[in-house]
């Protein structure tokens, strides 16, 4: 019983919980992920009934779980028969709990085979991750065109205000991109595209200028300008024929004909890098400010993790960074401790009752391909993979300089670092060896065997 009592102290979270009651937020619905082909109105996930706090017989998930997003929260930014761009809303609009990351936006892009995205720039720094397909990106830097090939697993950054375009030169597969924007607009969390080429659909930035200004700027008659700037009506993403695509590829620029262009950053592939951590349960790879100058400029770390079937990440938290995670493939679930939701439910606070009566809400959600979830700094979380297959997760850590990951369980758990006497006094367990037995029972670290595999493979420590 002593062991059970200690385990309860170590792992207890309020019995109240927040569960999803509708399909979880999915960019899979938008075709960002190659294994998802349909885009039905109701998404790809069956409705799940919750077991948390109910109001009127049903949870108000938007109010009580602001950390996981439904597919209907994605907004179409641009759409045509050749592809589309979608974005989550401003995080600050979703909940006051997310105002600290309102400057950041999550977007997704799908471009059908043999398509081009119009040249434009945005008032945001753009970190892209290629979730499927291949193609290339071209952007203007120091009055030169820099072209970089893209393939699945690549990470690349485009500075704010620099004109760029994307090309899918594949004959068969769509180019799919998930990305994070850090907006630079005076309107916090808002970003806009500025098209320097186009016509009627979409309009270009030239449409805002008067005819006489344009005539003078281009030294060209306004009738000819109207013909040029009014011809395109095919949308932001449009088809090109195979010969046009081949000509763009023949034109070169990938090896950079000038010294200044060759010095520009190149994509790096997270999937092909040596893992930062790996054991029998899974692995993860990450790149941050110290590894890439663009990531340094936005203070973001990008990571990619794989959990093998039936495994879990050890409960842990970021000391400083907030994580925005996207499930690339697989199924599972998350559990996260949150003190703020407990306060929203009206539970007593230390000031009200005069003692440290703190309640942690268990935030939980099913994970499927395309689920997006936010993990605020300091919030302990665990991701648990289904026994049916691997769980692959892409994440962006925001405000990552000086951040550390502290593990609350596993061989390297933070309690092991504390002085033994402090551990014994803090848990108020007379026999100190019981505490040490519990803390040393787990031989793995970072990625562990999950609940189902633990029950199947070996008995737990008991006394």
From Swiss-Prot:
Cu cation binds at residues 338, 340, 379. Expressed in seed. Glycans are attached at residue 399. InterPro entries: Cupin_1, RmlC-like_jellyroll, RmlC_Cupin_sf, Seed_Storage-Functional. Keywords: Allergen, Copper, Glycoprotein, Metal-binding, Seed storage protein, Signal, Storage protein. Residues 74-226, 268-435 form the Cupin type-1 domain. It comes from the Eukaryota. One of its GO terms (molecular function) is copper ion binding. The record marks 55-56, 260-261, 353-354 as: Cleavage. The keyword Hydrolase does not apply. Residues 1-19 form the signal peptide. Residues 40-64, 252-280 are annotated as: Disordered. Stable up to 80 degrees Celsius. One of its GO terms (biological process) is protein homotrimerization. Seed storage protein. Homotrimer. Belongs to the 7S seed storage protein family. This is Vicilin Pin k 2.0101.
